[in-house]
Swiss-Prot record:
Protein name, per record: Exoglucanase 1
Family: Belongs to the glycosyl hydrolase 7 (cellulase C) family.
Protein source organism: Phanerodontia chrysosporium
Single Gene Ontology MF annotation: cellulose 1,4-beta-cellobiosidase activity
Catalytic residues (positions): 225, 230
Length: 516
């Protein structure tokens, strides 16, 4: 949330974006290995790569090296209107490490906060040189390791899914000649208006400077977003954001408005601190952010298949070889659950006095449709010119009593996160994402589940029986056959171990066996 107009890049005297292809700097896509995992075949490597978002690239005239955009203004001659600008201006390649502080090695990606005059970055995972890797995650899970020990208050090391086009919009918009190869086609639930090119045209009409290096135009670019991870070493949240239109859509006027427009910009977040457990995640806490750990997110459907409807999003962690169940809610008026469901979101909005825009935009079902079609993985590091990241790690809004439910989100001071200060004081901050895996439930992680971490706090509104190894689903009485997708075994399980015909009991891990 609040991602609009916060990602800044200062390179070659311009923050740049374009739709033609330049030749001054060679185009490259650093390799970043990921893995696809199945119950039958285990995990196998994918030859995935990364590409820098086009908003960071140098934009110059196709006939030379005149900047099409300098400081916070478009060149009036090259860019008198959106279509002319798209024809006149070209994107170039990128020096990932030297200019942008982006280093990929094996399955590990390091994003440096400040490198020279560049601040922040955003990259996408690619399946090949011309297409983004598309993630279809219904009845699947997504796992990664993160080291955010050097990510202080006010910064956000984000890993999230966006309903972008696989080719970056080339097929839809013929004036876009660069495509995914150059990181085009961005959209999210904030309907950002600071994106330089949308739908193959420059966003020059109505352009107004908002800072020394950025501005906003008449248009925004909207799509459903799934924030798997927004965090620093003081706070973390995962948040689904539905839009009434899942595919990338250009907005104008009231359609771009937060929450009442095409998208639910605030979303339905699960931040452990905000949900009442202030000892769960942080430096030296249950999930110790001073050390690396694994984050697992499971997308549960109503029928336990990829054809079903998204009804629940679960979270668990693995650190020091131990599986850690997500924290449970400790807020009056909200059931003590530890996952996101439509019921949780409804109760949360009521308890916090917020309008339920999440439900108005279609809730989990709508997010699930984007996950069914396929979403693009974005990884970024950024600071927040709109709200100083207080919505993530401090008290927000700052004019409300911190004791009011939903206001306190972390321990960072309300004076923290000012971009000018954090860029000067913490230029060497960074985040490392590694070991990206996705696939069948309970196949992308390993770890020991202690009895104290086993919880039955998943929402009862989910009708799925594909449960995480760290949860305790209802057991079947002994002597009763277990239906397809039901639990049939595991440490601590006391129910029936006989599956209904023609299904058999399969061991998924020591703590959970399932009929299928």
């Amino acid at each position: 949330m609040f991602r609009t107009a916060t990602l800044l890049a200062f390179t070659m005297a311009a923050m740049v974006f374009g739709q033609q292809v330049g030749t001054n700097t060679a185009r490259s896509h650093p390799a970043l290995t990921s893995q696809k995992c199945t119950k039958s075949g285990g995990c196998s490597n994918l030859n995935t790569k990364i590409v820098l978002d086009a908003n960071w690239r140098w934009l110059h005239s196709t006939s030379g090296y005149t900047n099409c955009y300098t400081g916070n203004q478009w060149d009036a001659t090259l860019c008198p209107d959106g279509k002319t600008c798209a024809a006149n201006c070209a994107l170039d390649g990128a020096d990932y490490t030297g200019t942008y502080g982006i280093t990929a090695s094996g399955s590990s990606l390091k994003l440096q906060f400040v490198t020279g005059s560049n601040v922040g970055s955003r990259v996408y995972l690619m399946a090949d040189d011309t297409h983004y890797q598309m993630f279809q995650l219904l009845n699947q899970e997504f796992t990664f390791d993160v080291d955010m020990s050097n990510l202080p208050c006010g910064l956000n090391g984000a890993l999230y899914l966006s309903a972008m086009d696989a080719d970056g919009g080339m097929a839809k918009y013929p004036t876009n000649k660069a495509g995914a190869k150059y990181g085009t086609g961005y959209c999210d639930s904030q309907c950002p208006r600071d994106i330089k090119f949308i739908n193959g045209e420059a966003n020059v009409e109505g352009w107004n400077a908002t800072s020394a290096n950025a501005g906003t135009g008449n248009y925004g670019t909207c799509c459903t977003e799934m924030d798997i991870w927004e965090a620093n070493n003081d706070a973390a949240a995962y948040t689904p954001h539905p839009c009434t239109t899942n595919a990338q859509t250009r907005c104008s006027g009231s359609d771009c408005t937060r929450d009442t427009g095409l998208c639910d910009a605030d979303g339905c977040d699960f931040n452990s601190f905000r949900m009442g457990d202030q000892t769960f995640l942080g430096k030296g806490l249950t999930v110790d952010t001073s050390k690396p750990f694994t984050v697992v997110t499971q997308f549960i459907t109503n029928d336990g298949t990829s054809a079903g409807t998204l009804t629940e999003i679960r979270r668990l962690y693995v650190q020091n070889g131990k599986v850690i169940q997500n924290s449970s809610v400790k807020i009056p008026g909200i059931d003590p659950v530890n996952s996101i469901t439509d019921n949780f979101c409804s109760q949360q909005k009521t308890a916090f006095g917020d309008t339920n825009y999440f439900a108005q935009h279609g809730g989990l079902k709508q997010v699930g449709e984007a996950l069914r079609t396929g979403m693009v993985l974005a990884l970024s590091i950024w600071d927040d010119y709109a709200a100083n990241m207080l919505w993530l790690d401090s008290n927000y809004p700052t004019n409300k009593d911190p004791s009011t439910p939903g206001v306190a989100r972390g321990t960072c001071a309300t004076t923290s996160g000012v971009p000018a200060q954090i860029e000067a004081q913490s230029p060497n901050a960074y985040v490392v994402f590694s070991n990206i895996k996705f696939g069948d439930l309970n196949t992308t992680y390993t770890g020991t589940v202690s009895s104290s971490s086993v919880s039955s706090s998943h929402s009862s509104t989910s009708t799925s029986s594909s449960h995480s190894s760290s949860s305790t689903p209802p057991t079947q009485p002994t002597g009763v056959t277990v239906p397809q997708w039901g639990q049939c075994g595991g440490i601590g399980y006391t129910g029936s171990t006989t599956c209904a015909s023609p299904y058999t009991c399969h061991v998924l891990n020591p703590y959970y066996s399932q009929c299928y």
